[in-house]
Curated annotation (Swiss-Prot):
InterPro entries: Amino_oxidase (IPR002937), carotdesatCrtD (IPR054841), Carotenoid/retinoid_OxRdtase (IPR014105), FAD/NAD-bd_sf (IPR036188). Gene3D superfamilies: FAD/NAD(P)-binding domain. The keyword Metal-binding does not apply. This is Hydroxyneurosporene desaturase. Its EC number is 1.3.99.27. Belongs to the carotenoid/retinoid oxidoreductase family. It is an enzyme of class 1 (oxidoreductase). The lineage of its organism: Bacteria, Pseudomonadati, Pseudomonadota, Betaproteobacteria, Burkholderiales. The preferred substrates are 1-hydroxy-neurosporene, 1-hydroxy-lycopene and 1,1-dihydroxyneurosporene, however the 3,4-didehydrolycopene derivatives such as 1,1-dihydroxy-3,4-didehydrolycopene, 1-methoxy-1-hydroxy-3,4-didehydrolycopene and 1-hydroxy-3,4-didehydrolycopene are also efficiently converted. 1-HO-carotene derivatives can be also used.
Length: 525
């Protein structure tokens, strides 16, 4: 490896999955990498909280797109199997509706899902489901390269990369339509429309404003959903351990107060205690709005555009639970639907209030496809979508208690009873998320994916400030653990490409007889 690569210093700010990925891959390429995070442990949103003596995963709960992690570990000279224990789930999710029997399971086996839908909604809906899955597969196959793997896709580059067949597949789903309208063409049963419309919330969006292309989430789940031994926080710990083994210097419990800028480029960071760490490049794994609002200093404001509050994605009320349950056969992922799905998103995005008929998602963290085999307390994450207004109001008990009681009532009407007490659960509100992740209002998915052009409006890994690179769920390709990991990979690849380009150009200059500065003190293009 050339000397400039061995001596190039990088500071990664934020140890979410994107920052961990960038740090790991850059260190694996031989760069001098320091990773800082204000939290005492790695993971960002993939954190754990102690509830009545047990650690409960408090953030993302779904492990999909395993190929993303396989490729990242391979690039670092390791395998996922060496660091994580994964169990494929046969049941992707169990769905229930207020006052409605039976329940509906979706399976990793598409034929089993079709059979279940046939029993639930009739044979014609089962055939429509298979057609829906075929279209989702085609859409995913066409968009994976031009969009997910691309550093900065534009409408023009997408059109060119898709080619005639890809464009035809895209036009068949009605790309200018919203997800709900598209689903109404696929399914007649409103409960199936409601079930698959929930895919919009994976990006923090409303099905009535999200683009129809989000139907590709169906294919992501069909490609596999895994349970991680130790929970999703174990993924962060595995990344951190491998990064340290590859030479990354981790500084947990050290918040970044300012990104240092000199001569128009990022040159390091100042920690909350006043310590300065100089660097040739900085990777910022945090919400881009923190930069735009000047929370990392005034000079980095210009690095990216601000996200207006109206463009924020969903936040949530989450209850972290360690309690006994009864009456409902929970699996790993469970969804309890209320009636009038449209009102949930009208309440959140238009009325800016907690939903009066909110869907409740429950991750039963001690279960896979089967029960836990005892009446011992089990760890749950219960989630209801909420407006990202955590910087505008406190979300105190006068607002959250009625939502909590409505959510418990919905689960009871679907058959689930939880031993609920102040000791067995902890509530996290949008205001809490805002304090954990400043400048977001508590939004958990970056900008909302609303409108067919929204995917092109996300910041890319290359910021407007030379030497500063961006990674995370608010950055392309978007939210979710695998996509955020992909953004970290794209940031690392972009930084390396700039560094390689600069090294080559300097070698050309030197060969021409002109002097040049060391790559450790100069900038990258």
């Amino acid at each position: 490896m050339a000397e400039p690569l061995r001596t190039h210093r990088v500071v990664v700010v934020g140890a979410g999955i994107a920052g961990l990925t960038s740090a790991l891959l850059l260190a694996a390429r031989g760069l001098d990498v320091t990773l800082v995070d204000k939290a005492a442990t790695p993971g960002g949103k993939m954190r754990q909280v102690m509830v009545d003596g047990a650690p409960v995963d408090a953030g993302p709960t779904v492990f999909t797109m395993r190929w993303v992690f396989d490729q990242i570990f391979a690039a670092a000279g390791a395998t996922v199997e060496e660091h994580l224990k994964l169990q494929p789930l046969g049941v992707l999710a169990r769905h229930a509706w207020r006052g409605h029997e039976p329940r509906l399971d979706l399976f990793a086996d598409i034929r089993r899902s079709a059979e279940a839908i046939g029993e639930f909604s009739g044979p014609q809906e089962a055939q429509r489901f298979l057609g829906f899955c075929r279209q989702a597969r085609q859409l995913y196959d066409h968009l994976e390269g031009p969009y997910i793997r691309s550093e900065r896709p534009t409408l023009g580059s997408m059109v060119g990369d898709l080619g005639p067949r890809g464009l035809m597949a895209l036009m068949q789903i009605g790309p200018f339509s919203n997800l709900w309208r598209s689903l109404s063409r696929h399914f007649r049963d409103p409960k199936l429309q409601q079930l698959f419309a929930r895919y919009a919330t994976y990006c923090g969006a409303s099905p009535w404003m999200a683009p129809a292309t989000l139907m590709l989430v169906a294919q992501v789940e069909l490609d596999g959903v895994w349970a991680v031994e130790g929970g999703m926080h174990a993924v962060a710990k595995a990344f951190s351990a491998l990064a340290e083994a590859r030479g990354v210097k981790t500084r947990y419990g050290c918040g970044c107060e300012q990104i240092l800028v000199r001569d128009g480029r990022a040159v390091g960071v100042r920690l909350a205690g006043g310590e300065e760490i100089t660097a040739d490049s900085v990777v910022f794994n945090g919400d881009v709005n923190a930069l735009a609002q000047g929370l990392l200093g005034d000079p980095p404001r210009r690095a990216t555009a601000a996200v207006a509050p109206a463009r924020r994605s969903l936040s949530a009320l989450t209850w972290l639970v360690n309690a006994r349950t009864s009456g409902f056969p929970l699996v790993r992922h469970n969804v309890f639907f209320d009636e009038d799905y449209a009102s949930e998103f009208d309440d959140i995005f238009r009325q800016r209030q907690l939903p009066r008929r909110g869907t409740v998602y429950v991750c039963a963290q001690d279960r896979t496809d089967e029960g836990i085999g005892s009446d011992a307390p089990e760890r749950l994450l219960c989630l209801v979508n909420a407006p990202a207004d955590g910087d505008r109001r406190p979300f105190d008990h006068s607002e959250t208690d009625p939502c909590e009681q409505r959510s418990l009532a919905l689960m009871r009407e679907c058959g689930l009873t939880i031993d609920w007490s102040p000791q067995t659960h902890r509530l996290v509100t949008p205001a809490n998320f805002e304090r954990l992740f400043p400048a977001t209002g508590g939004a958990l998915y970056g900008p909302a994916t609303h409108g067919w052009m929204s995917s092109f409006h996300r910041a890319s890994s290359t910021s407007r400030l030379p030497g500063l690179y961006l990674a995370g769920g608010s950055v392309h390709p978007g939210p979710g653990v695998p996509m955020a990991a992909m953004s970290g990979r794209l940031a690392a690849e972009t930084l390396m490409a700039h560094l390689d380009s600069t090294s080559r150009s300097r070698r050309v200059v030197i060969s021409g007889g002109m002097s040049t500065r060391s790559a450790t003190t100069g900038g990258m293009a």
